[in-house]
């Protein structure tokens, strides 16, 4: 017995397959896989099988069995098969080796280090260490050599992954209906505003960027892109307001990529401390956004337009494995997309320096500043080593820019151009808006009627609470509707999985809280249902903006009852502004609220971002906004020399103007202590 046991033990080896493991497959530890590293197929004939790592300091082994992903499994739930990025220095095999056609350049001044078999198409796909001027070259990547942009070889597999095919439902192909946007008003303001461009052409855009734009099937620039491209190329700061789905992401990515392709990388500064310099990232462009989903989406767009170029995009956000994000940055980080919290964390760890930043972008800037991100933003912009205002370009993009946010933005912008495109802070006429009067107890039955009637396409349902999101999705599943949900209590992996199922149509109904409301570009959403209306009409605008994107059409249905009367006036104005049908019950409740004093955030004619002079107007041009004739408070006050916004009829006081003209609490109301709504009427309450 002992002899048999010894014999069995002698036959075991580290390479022996484990129970349930295919022969030749490496043992793996399950770990989080970010969305940009998922769905990558291994080589034909060996699905899911990782390729054994070549020995240290030896060239990679090209051949039919190699995998461009270093063996990452094609399952969204699979482990990240022995991802062992080595940042070490040392060996003599400094360059990468491309097993495609043609000779490949060897390692540059920052090459060196161990062979990294799992480098994700980074600049050191062949060698460790690295930055954007040295190391190896992965497939689909270019380089900057001696002042010239060397375009990389094509990679059909990566190209298909990035751009899809013409009939791929998971990829959005824009440029279809933008000809209809030619009559949309565009209002630039500022000193010496450059003339807009009318087409994607060279000049002004780099020829390689144009080829990537063509691969993405963009045909003509959107209104915001027509103006933002020449404004940024001419070195100006920009504050851009444009309706949701109007191409804001391209509005900042196109000119930044163009400048990067023509000017090349900034030199790495001399650093004391020796051997850790290669482990710190020195991006030249920083894009900040408020949510994990939005930064992932911007990153995927950046990958498209950086294809075959020297620019290496990276993404960092909370809720994901920080180790994999650090390894990605070590392989080159020229354009960084980040959430503020994770970026501050990495700065504190000494892994990111902002001293080379040429371009700072704040996407969904109003939400980041208005909802509590201001301290983190100010620390990143003003408290670290980022170049000061005037030494960098700062771009702010969003669908709404209320006047108080514009005033805060002055600290980040220098001699900027304010760009208002279309009905900013409003909704697109491409969206057909319907408002139905539905009591809370009837919402489920009415929802079922709508889903039966509007079968087909993707339907996004917004609710107010996490509990309701799970409850409603379970109810729909029990009614034989393929549904899933997304909210803040679900893990990052669960949220990304739910979004993927929704995007590819396997679960065409998504129930969501506000976590998915802003910025997410989900193609082919044909119907948005506000099961629970938000208390802020700006949130309503962003919710329904998930459909009707990129010039296409969509339907937005809202369930309204008297519990939502706090936004009735603004909702009414919104419908009229977008030439939508206004139901009679909405007019009736609006009149009741005007004279009966319903509480809530009634913001009148001079209100925040809507009506007369609001969030789509450059506040530098005008003074104070007056109060509205409604139950809500008065409008926001004006600029430095404007008068404070007075209270509306029956309403409490509005915000005042700038400190020079009375500060918050200008007008008659006496500041924040004024009524929030109508203190004397039904439903009114003090702000405090």
Curated annotation (Swiss-Prot):
A motif (DEAD box) lies at residues 363-366. It is an enzyme of class 3 (hydrolase). Residues 1-141, 593-623 are annotated as: Disordered. GO terms for molecular function: ATP binding; ATP hydrolysis activity; eukaryotic initiation factor 4G binding; G-quadruplex DNA binding; G-quadruplex RNA binding; mRNA binding; RNA helicase activity; RNA strand annealing activity. Residues 87-99, 124-139, 595-615 have a biased composition (Gly residues). SUPFAM superfamilies: P-loop containing nucleoside triphosphate hydrolases. It catalyses: ATP + H2O = ADP + phosphate + H(+). Gene3D superfamilies: P-loop containing nucleotide triphosphate hydrolases. Its EC number is 3.6.4.13. Coiled coil: none annotated. It is found in: Cytoplasm. A motif (Q motif) lies at residues 198-226. ATP binds at residues 242-249. GO terms for cellular component: cytoplasmic stress granule; spliceosomal complex. This is ATP-dependent RNA helicase DED1. The lineage of its organism: Eukaryota, Fungi, Dikarya, Ascomycota, Pezizomycotina.
């Amino acid at each position: 017995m002992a002899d048999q046991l010894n014999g069995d033990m002698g036959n075991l080896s580290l390479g022996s397959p484990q129970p349930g493991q295919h022969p030749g497959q490496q043992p793996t530890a399950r770990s989080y896989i970010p969305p940009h590293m998922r769905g990558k197929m291994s080589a034909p004939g060996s699905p899911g099988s990782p390729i054994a790592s070549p020995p240290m300091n030896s060239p990679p082994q090209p051949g039919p069995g190699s995998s461009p992903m270093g063996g990452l499994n094609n399952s969204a739930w699979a482990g990240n098969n022995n991802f062992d990025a080595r940042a070490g220095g040392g060996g003599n095999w400094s360059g990468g080796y491309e097993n495609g056609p043609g000779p490949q350049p060897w390692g540059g001044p920052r090459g060196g280090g161990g062979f990294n078999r799992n480098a994700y198409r980074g600049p050191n796909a062949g060698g460790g260490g690295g930055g954007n001027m040295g190391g190896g070259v992965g497939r689909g990547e270019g380089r900057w050599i001696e002042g010239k942009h060397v375009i990389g070889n094509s990679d059909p597999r990566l190209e298909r992954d990035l751009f899809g095919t013409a009939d791929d439902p998971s990829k959005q192909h824009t440029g279809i209906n933008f000809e209809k946007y030619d009559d949309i008003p565009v209002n630039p303001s500022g000193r010496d505003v450059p003339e807009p461009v009318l087409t994607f052409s060279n000049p002004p855009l780099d020829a390689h960027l144009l080829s990537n734009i063509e691969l993405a099937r963009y045909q003509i620039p959107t209104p915001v892109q027509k103006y933002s491209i020449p404004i940024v190329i001419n070195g100006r700061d920009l504050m851009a307001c444009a309706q949701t789905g109007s191409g804001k992401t391209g509005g900042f990515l196109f000119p930044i990529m163009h400048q990067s392709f023509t000017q090349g990388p900034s030199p790495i500064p001399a650093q004391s401390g020796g051997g850790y310099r290669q482990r710190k990232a020195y991006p030249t462009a920083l894009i900040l956004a408020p949510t994990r989903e939005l930064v992932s989406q911007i990153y995927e767009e950046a990958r498209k337009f950086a294809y075959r170029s020297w620019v290496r995009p990276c993404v960092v956000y909370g809720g994901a494995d920080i180790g994999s994000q650090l390894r990605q940055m070590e392989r080159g980080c020229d354009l960084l997309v980040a959430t503020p919290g994770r970026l501050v964390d990495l700065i504190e760890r000494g892994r990111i320096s902002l001293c080379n930043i040429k371009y700072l972008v704040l996407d969904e800037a109003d939400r980041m500043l208005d909802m509590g991100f201001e301290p983190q933003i100010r620390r990143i912009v003003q408290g670290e080593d980022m170049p000061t205002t005037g030494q960098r370009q700062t771009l702010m993009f969003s669908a709404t820019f209320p006047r108080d946010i514009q005033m805060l933005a002055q600290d980040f912008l220098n001699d900027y151009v304010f760009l208002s495109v279309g009905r900013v802070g409003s909704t697109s006429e491409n969206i057909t808006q319907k408002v139905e009067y539905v009591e809370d107890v009837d919402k489920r039955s009415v929802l079922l009627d709508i889903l039966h009637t509007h079968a087909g396409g993707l339907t996004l349902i917004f609710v107010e609470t996490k509990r309701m999101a799970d409850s409603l999705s379970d109810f729909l599943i029990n009614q034989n509707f393929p549904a899933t949900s997304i909210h803040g209590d679900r893990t990052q992996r669960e949220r990304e999985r739910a979004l993927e199922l929704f995007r590819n149509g396997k679960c065409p109904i998504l129930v969501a809280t506000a976590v998915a409301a802003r910025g997410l570009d989900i193609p082919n959403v044909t119907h948005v249902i506000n099961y629970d209306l938000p208390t802020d009409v700006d949130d309503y605008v962003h919710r329904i903006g998930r459909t009707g994107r990129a010039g296409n059409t969509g339907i937005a249905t809202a369930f309204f009852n008297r519990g939502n009367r706090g936004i009735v006036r603004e909702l009414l104005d919104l419908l009229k502004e977008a030439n939508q049908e206004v139901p009679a019950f909405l007019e009736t409740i609006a009149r009741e609220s005007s004279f009966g004093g319903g509480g809530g955030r009634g913001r009148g004619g001079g209100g925040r971002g809507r009506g007369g002079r609001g969030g789509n107007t450059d506040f530098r041009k005008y003074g104070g906004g007056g109060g509205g004739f409604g139950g809500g408070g008065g409008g926001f006050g004006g600029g430095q020399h404007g008068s404070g916004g007075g209270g509306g009829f029956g309403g409490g006081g509005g915000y005042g103007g700038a400190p020079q003209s009375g500060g918050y609490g200008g007008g008659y109301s006496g500041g924040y202590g004024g009524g929030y709504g109508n203190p004397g009427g039904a439903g009114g309450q003090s702000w405090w």
